Amino acid sequence: MTGGMMRIALIWLLVAVPGAGADRQVAITIDDLPRGGDSADKASRTFAEIRGMTERLLAPLRQQQIPVTGFVHPGRTELAAPDLRRILDLWLDAGADLGNHTWSHADLNRTTVADYEQEILKAETVLLPVVKARGKQLEFFRYPMLHTGPVAETKRAIAEFLAAHGYRNAPVTFDNSDYMFAAAYTRPELRARAAQEYLPYLESVVAFFERRSVEVVGREFPQIMLMHASELNSRMMPDLLAMFRRRGYRFVALGEALQDAAYRLPENYVGPGGFSWIHRWSMTKGMPNKGEPDEPEWVRTAAAKR
């Protein structure tokens, strides 16, 4: 075994050893601020609608003092700059951290390295003044659609750019199709069904990744939940938080979750896909693929018609 292979094997061995009294932890992260996943109709994009959705979404997080990180794409909104600032201030008022999600939700599969870098920098022009006014930093970046680079050169170039600009990647372990349910929820004839089936679907995904964590990493570890800023999640957040508590979770900040050694595991996936880091680690180990539960076909159809 070469020295490099021995180091990798040692990392996997150390990561797989659970700590005494280990408990379940999850970091809540919410993408596509100010609103995403369900904003195809113009009425949902007004300041009043986005403010109401945001206040409902944040209320249980604020009341329960749950850390949350919101990822912003400032160029994907019709809000005037002062109104966008008001929405982002609502997040900061609730104790949230804000992260960079590129200017316009840029897809690294379809964007040159130079243009993608400009997307990141352009988003900073909006986000840095907002967070600095609160004494915070712009620490985290999340790849839109979890696309980290279709070829090795692109992946490496953007990772190096992010590091040079002081960003930490915000991976996802609890990946899911909440945005599809959110789209279905906007249709009056599907709203009740979407609300009824949403939490059972999410819990099935969480249960899958809990099991898969043990198979891939050797133990459960602090997970990172991906959600989107949507009307559905603003209505279902109390139930979603209760679901996690029922499963034995406590809520931690993104930075705290990332301190776990699991997030230092080798991850060498290169390609067009965007999926959970648990899948990426399993691929790096050469394990057979196992996919999380799919969203129902009717949800997929409804989202496609949006």
Model-predicted regions and their roles:
Residues 91-96, 164-168, 281:
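Structural recognition of alpha->loop->beta junctions
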Residues 62, 171, 229-306:
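C-terminal domain-boundary segment and adjacent tail
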Residues 78-83, 103-250, 256:
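Catalytic domains of cell-wall/extracellular-matrix polysaccharide-remodeling enzymes
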Residues 89-90, 119, 151, 190, ...:
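Short alpha-helix boundary/capping motifs
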Residues 12-21:
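Hydrophobic h-region of N-terminal signal peptides that target proteins for export
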Residues 3-12:
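Sec-dependent signal peptide recognition
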Residues 34, 144, 179, 296-297:
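Proline-rich low-complexity regions
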Residues 22-146, 225, 243, 259:
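Active-site beta->alpha N-cap acidic-glycine motif
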